[in-house]
Amino acid sequence: MSATPDRKGQLGPGDIRARKGGEPVVCLTAYTTPMARLVDAHCDIALVGDSLGMVLHGLPSTIGVSMEMMILHGKAVARGCSRACIVVDMPFGSYEEGPEQAFRNAARLMAETGCQAVKLEGGRHMAETVAFLVARGIPVMGHVGLTPQSVNTLGGYKVQGRGHHEADRIAADAAALADAGAFAVVLEKLPEALGRRITQEIAVPTIGIGAGLDCDGQVLVVDDMLGLFSDFRPKFVKRYAELGQDADAAIAAYAAEVRARRFPGPEHVFGEGKPA
Protein backbone atom coordinates (compact mmCIF):
# COMPACT_ATOMS: atom_id res chain seq x y z
CA MET A 1 0.00 0.00 0.00
CA SER A 2 1.28 3.45 -0.89
CA ALA A 3 2.11 5.84 1.94
CA THR A 4 1.20 8.78 -0.28
CA PRO A 5 -2.20 10.30 0.64
CA ASP A 6 -5.04 10.26 -1.89
CA ARG A 7 -5.33 13.93 -2.90
CA LYS A 8 -8.38 13.81 -5.16
CA GLY A 9 -10.33 16.03 -2.78
CA GLN A 10 -7.46 18.31 -1.81
CA LEU A 11 -8.14 22.03 -1.57
CA GLY A 12 -6.23 24.27 -3.92
CA PRO A 13 -5.43 27.98 -4.03
CA GLY A 14 -8.56 28.61 -6.11
CA ASP A 15 -10.71 27.03 -3.41
CA ILE A 16 -9.11 29.25 -0.78
CA ARG A 17 -9.59 32.36 -2.91
CA ALA A 18 -13.27 31.50 -3.38
CA ARG A 19 -13.76 31.63 0.40
CA LYS A 20 -13.48 35.44 0.41
CA GLY A 21 -16.23 36.78 2.66
CA GLY A 22 -17.52 33.29 3.40
CA GLU A 23 -16.68 30.61 5.94
CA PRO A 24 -13.43 31.58 7.69
CA VAL A 25 -10.29 29.91 6.39
CA VAL A 26 -8.53 27.82 9.05
CA CYS A 27 -4.75 27.61 8.80
CA LEU A 28 -2.05 26.19 11.05
CA THR A 29 1.62 25.56 10.51
CA ALA A 30 2.90 22.01 10.17
CA TYR A 31 6.47 20.77 9.86
CA THR A 32 6.27 16.98 10.28
CA THR A 33 4.15 14.15 8.90
CA PRO A 34 2.38 13.31 12.21
CA MET A 35 1.47 16.95 12.82
CA ALA A 36 0.42 17.36 9.19
CA ARG A 37 -2.10 14.53 9.62
CA LEU A 38 -3.63 16.28 12.62
CA VAL A 39 -3.75 19.64 10.85
CA ASP A 40 -5.14 18.05 7.68
CA ALA A 41 -8.11 16.63 9.57
CA HIS A 42 -9.36 20.03 10.70
CA CYS A 43 -7.75 22.85 8.69
CA ASP A 44 -8.01 24.29 5.19
CA ILE A 45 -4.34 25.25 4.85
CA ALA A 46 -1.23 23.52 6.17
CA LEU A 47 1.48 26.17 6.14
CA VAL A 48 5.06 24.93 6.14
CA GLY A 49 6.31 28.11 7.73
CA ASP A 50 9.90 29.23 7.99
CA SER A 51 9.08 29.57 11.69
CA LEU A 52 10.35 25.98 11.74
CA GLY A 53 13.82 27.47 12.06
CA MET A 54 12.97 28.81 15.50
CA VAL A 55 10.45 26.18 16.60
CA LEU A 56 12.27 23.03 15.49
CA HIS A 57 15.88 24.02 14.87
CA GLY A 58 16.55 26.49 17.67
CA LEU A 59 17.51 29.40 15.43
CA PRO A 60 17.12 32.93 16.85
CA SER A 61 15.03 34.07 13.86
CA THR A 62 13.77 32.86 10.49
CA ILE A 63 16.67 34.46 8.63
CA GLY A 64 18.91 31.38 8.86
CA VAL A 65 16.38 29.02 7.28
CA SER A 66 17.54 27.44 4.01
CA MET A 67 15.83 26.07 0.91
CA GLU A 68 16.97 22.60 1.92
CA MET A 69 15.22 22.92 5.28
CA MET A 70 11.99 24.07 3.66
CA ILE A 71 12.11 21.23 1.13
CA LEU A 72 12.79 18.61 3.80
CA HIS A 73 9.85 19.70 5.93
CA GLY A 74 7.64 20.40 2.93
CA LYS A 75 8.05 16.80 1.80
CA ALA A 76 7.21 15.55 5.29
CA VAL A 77 4.03 17.63 5.44
CA ALA A 78 2.95 16.53 1.96
CA ARG A 79 3.10 12.91 3.12
CA GLY A 80 0.55 13.71 5.81
CA CYS A 81 -1.96 15.85 3.92
CA SER A 82 -4.80 14.65 1.71
CA ARG A 83 -7.25 17.55 2.11
CA ALA A 84 -5.56 20.76 3.26
CA CYS A 85 -3.91 23.09 0.76
CA ILE A 86 -0.15 22.93 1.38
CA VAL A 87 1.66 26.26 1.26
CA VAL A 88 5.44 26.45 1.73
CA ASP A 89 7.29 29.59 2.79
CA MET A 90 10.06 30.85 0.55
CA PRO A 91 13.04 31.37 2.88
CA PHE A 92 15.02 34.57 3.27
CA GLY A 93 17.36 35.16 0.34
CA SER A 94 15.53 32.86 -2.06
CA TYR A 95 13.41 35.45 -3.90
CA GLU A 96 14.50 39.01 -3.14
CA GLU A 97 16.96 39.42 -6.05
CA GLY A 98 14.20 39.45 -8.63
CA PRO A 99 11.46 37.51 -10.38
CA GLU A 100 13.79 35.07 -12.13
CA GLN A 101 15.49 34.00 -8.90
CA ALA A 102 12.10 33.73 -7.22
CA PHE A 103 10.78 31.54 -10.03
CA ARG A 104 13.73 29.16 -9.92
CA ASN A 105 13.36 28.61 -6.19
CA ALA A 106 9.56 28.56 -6.13
CA ALA A 107 9.50 26.01 -8.95
CA ARG A 108 11.99 23.89 -7.03
CA LEU A 109 9.88 24.07 -3.87
CA MET A 110 6.75 22.99 -5.72
CA ALA A 111 8.45 20.25 -7.73
CA GLU A 112 10.32 18.71 -4.81
CA THR A 113 7.67 19.02 -2.08
CA GLY A 114 4.40 18.60 -3.95
CA CYS A 115 2.94 21.75 -2.36
CA GLN A 116 0.11 23.71 -3.97
CA ALA A 117 1.53 27.21 -3.42
CA VAL A 118 4.36 29.27 -1.97
CA LYS A 119 4.28 32.23 0.40
CA LEU A 120 6.59 35.21 0.29
CA GLU A 121 6.92 38.33 2.41
CA GLY A 122 6.84 41.94 1.27
CA GLY A 123 4.54 44.58 -0.15
CA ARG A 124 4.46 46.67 -3.31
CA HIS A 125 8.11 46.01 -4.11
CA MET A 126 7.24 42.29 -4.42
CA ALA A 127 4.20 42.78 -6.67
CA GLU A 128 6.21 42.33 -9.88
CA THR A 129 7.63 39.07 -8.55
CA VAL A 130 4.19 37.81 -7.52
CA ALA A 131 2.78 38.58 -10.97
CA PHE A 132 5.78 36.88 -12.62
CA LEU A 133 5.27 33.70 -10.59
CA VAL A 134 1.50 33.57 -11.03
CA ALA A 135 1.82 34.05 -14.79
CA ARG A 136 4.09 31.00 -14.86
CA GLY A 137 1.79 28.70 -12.91
CA ILE A 138 2.98 29.22 -9.35
CA PRO A 139 0.22 30.26 -6.93
CA VAL A 140 1.41 32.79 -4.35
CA MET A 141 0.21 33.76 -0.89
CA GLY A 142 1.37 37.22 0.18
CA HIS A 143 2.41 38.42 3.64
CA VAL A 144 2.38 42.02 4.89
CA GLY A 145 2.55 43.86 8.19
CA LEU A 146 5.10 42.30 10.49
CA THR A 147 7.32 40.35 8.12
CA PRO A 148 9.69 38.28 10.28
CA GLN A 149 12.38 38.01 7.60
CA SER A 150 12.71 41.82 7.83
CA VAL A 151 12.84 41.92 11.62
CA ASN A 152 16.24 43.62 11.59
CA THR A 153 14.94 46.57 9.58
CA LEU A 154 11.62 46.72 11.41
CA GLY A 155 13.32 47.10 14.79
CA GLY A 156 11.98 43.89 16.31
CA TYR A 157 8.68 42.03 16.47
CA LYS A 158 6.56 45.16 16.88
CA VAL A 159 2.97 45.90 15.94
CA GLN A 160 2.94 47.45 12.46
CA GLY A 161 0.55 49.97 10.91
CA ARG A 162 0.03 52.32 13.82
CA GLY A 163 -0.56 55.83 12.53
CA HIS A 164 -2.27 56.91 9.31
CA HIS A 165 0.84 56.91 7.13
CA GLU A 166 1.91 53.40 8.11
CA ALA A 167 -1.64 52.08 7.88
CA ASP A 168 -2.03 53.49 4.38
CA ARG A 169 1.32 52.00 3.36
CA ILE A 170 0.42 48.51 4.54
CA ALA A 171 -3.06 48.70 3.00
CA ALA A 172 -1.45 49.68 -0.31
CA ASP A 173 1.00 46.78 0.03
CA ALA A 174 -1.83 44.28 0.50
CA ALA A 175 -3.77 45.73 -2.43
CA ALA A 176 -0.71 45.54 -4.68
CA LEU A 177 -0.20 41.86 -3.88
CA ALA A 178 -3.87 41.08 -4.51
CA ASP A 179 -3.80 42.99 -7.80
CA ALA A 180 -0.64 41.09 -8.80
CA GLY A 181 -2.48 37.79 -8.47
CA ALA A 182 -1.86 36.56 -4.92
CA PHE A 183 -4.70 34.19 -3.95
CA ALA A 184 -4.57 35.28 -0.28
CA VAL A 185 -2.61 37.68 1.91
CA VAL A 186 -1.39 37.09 5.46
CA LEU A 187 -1.78 40.11 7.75
CA GLU A 188 0.55 39.89 10.73
CA LYS A 189 0.50 41.91 13.94
CA LEU A 190 -1.66 44.84 12.84
CA PRO A 191 -4.20 46.94 14.75
CA GLU A 192 -7.62 45.32 14.52
CA ALA A 193 -9.09 48.28 12.64
CA LEU A 194 -6.40 48.02 9.96
CA GLY A 195 -6.99 44.29 9.57
CA ARG A 196 -10.69 45.03 9.09
CA ARG A 197 -9.96 47.79 6.58
CA ILE A 198 -7.67 45.68 4.43
CA THR A 199 -10.12 42.77 4.51
CA GLN A 200 -12.83 45.09 3.21
CA GLU A 201 -10.62 46.67 0.56
CA ILE A 202 -8.98 43.72 -1.19
CA ALA A 203 -10.66 41.04 -3.28
CA VAL A 204 -8.78 38.03 -1.92
CA PRO A 205 -8.95 36.41 1.53
CA THR A 206 -6.93 37.90 4.35
CA ILE A 207 -5.41 35.42 6.79
CA GLY A 208 -4.81 37.08 10.11
CA ILE A 209 -2.19 36.40 12.72
CA GLY A 210 -2.65 39.08 15.31
CA ALA A 211 -4.77 41.21 12.95
CA GLY A 212 -8.22 40.87 14.49
CA LEU A 213 -11.41 38.88 14.15
CA ASP A 214 -12.59 40.41 10.88
CA CYS A 215 -9.98 38.75 8.66
CA ASP A 216 -11.21 36.10 6.24
CA GLY A 217 -9.22 33.45 8.11
CA GLN A 218 -6.72 32.90 10.89
CA VAL A 219 -3.32 31.25 11.20
CA LEU A 220 -1.19 30.35 14.20
CA VAL A 221 2.08 28.52 14.70
CA VAL A 222 0.87 25.10 15.82
CA ASP A 223 3.56 24.72 18.47
CA ASP A 224 2.47 28.04 19.98
CA MET A 225 -1.21 27.13 20.26
CA LEU A 226 -0.40 23.66 21.63
CA GLY A 227 1.99 24.99 24.26
CA LEU A 228 5.02 23.23 22.79
CA PHE A 229 7.12 26.36 22.17
CA SER A 230 7.77 28.43 25.27
CA ASP A 231 10.72 30.68 24.34
CA PHE A 232 8.25 33.55 23.98
CA ARG A 233 4.49 33.93 23.67
CA PRO A 234 3.02 36.65 21.44
CA LYS A 235 -0.12 38.38 22.69
CA PHE A 236 -2.11 37.09 19.71
CA VAL A 237 -1.51 33.44 20.64
CA LYS A 238 -4.23 31.53 22.47
CA ARG A 239 -3.03 28.35 24.12
CA TYR A 240 -5.48 25.55 23.38
CA ALA A 241 -3.34 22.99 25.23
CA GLU A 242 -0.21 22.80 27.37
CA LEU A 243 1.48 19.87 25.67
CA GLY A 244 4.93 21.09 26.66
CA GLN A 245 4.04 20.71 30.33
CA ASP A 246 2.43 17.33 29.67
CA ALA A 247 5.52 16.15 27.80
CA ASP A 248 7.82 17.37 30.58
CA ALA A 249 5.80 15.44 33.16
CA ALA A 250 5.77 12.30 31.00
CA ILE A 251 9.54 12.39 30.41
CA ALA A 252 10.16 12.99 34.11
CA ALA A 253 7.97 9.98 34.98
CA TYR A 254 9.81 7.81 32.46
CA ALA A 255 13.20 8.86 33.81
CA ALA A 256 12.10 8.14 37.37
CA GLU A 257 10.82 4.66 36.47
CA VAL A 258 14.00 3.76 34.58
CA ARG A 259 16.19 4.85 37.48
CA ALA A 260 14.01 2.94 39.94
CA ARG A 261 14.01 -0.13 37.65
CA ARG A 262 10.20 -0.05 37.37
CA PHE A 263 10.32 0.19 33.57
CA PRO A 264 10.12 -1.99 31.58
CA GLY A 265 7.43 -3.92 33.43
CA PRO A 266 6.32 -7.52 32.81
CA GLU A 267 3.90 -6.40 30.10
CA HIS A 268 6.71 -4.77 28.10
CA VAL A 269 9.21 -7.65 27.92
CA PHE A 270 9.50 -10.78 25.78
CA GLY A 271 10.05 -14.34 26.91
CA GLU A 272 9.65 -17.91 25.76
CA GLY A 273 6.08 -18.57 24.69
CA LYS A 274 4.95 -14.96 25.18
CA PRO A 275 3.24 -13.26 22.23
CA ALA A 276 5.23 -10.59 20.44
Curated annotation (Swiss-Prot):
It catalyses: 3-methyl-2-oxobutanoate + (6R)-5,10-methylene-5,6,7,8-tetrahydrofolate + H2O = 2-dehydropantoate + (6S)-5,6,7,8-tetrahydrofolate. Binds 1 Mg(2+) ion per subunit. Its main location: cytoplasm. GO terms for molecular function: 3-methyl-2-oxobutanoate hydroxymethyltransferase activity; magnesium ion binding. It is found in: Cytoplasm. 3-methyl-2-oxobutanoate binds at D50, S51, D89, K119. Pathway: Cofactor biosynthesis; (R)-pantothenate biosynthesis; (R)-pantoate from 3-methyl-2-oxobutanoate: step 1/2. GO terms for biological process: pantothenate biosynthetic process. The active site is at E188 (proton acceptor). Mg(2+) binds at D50, D89, E121. Keywords: Cytoplasm, Magnesium, Metal-binding, Pantothenate biosynthesis, Transferase. The keyword Kinase does not apply. Homodecamer; pentamer of dimers. NCBIfam families: panB (TIGR00222), PRK00311.1 (NF001452). This is 3-methyl-2-oxobutanoate hydroxymethyltransferase. It comes from Paracoccus denitrificans (strain Pd 1222). The gene is panB.
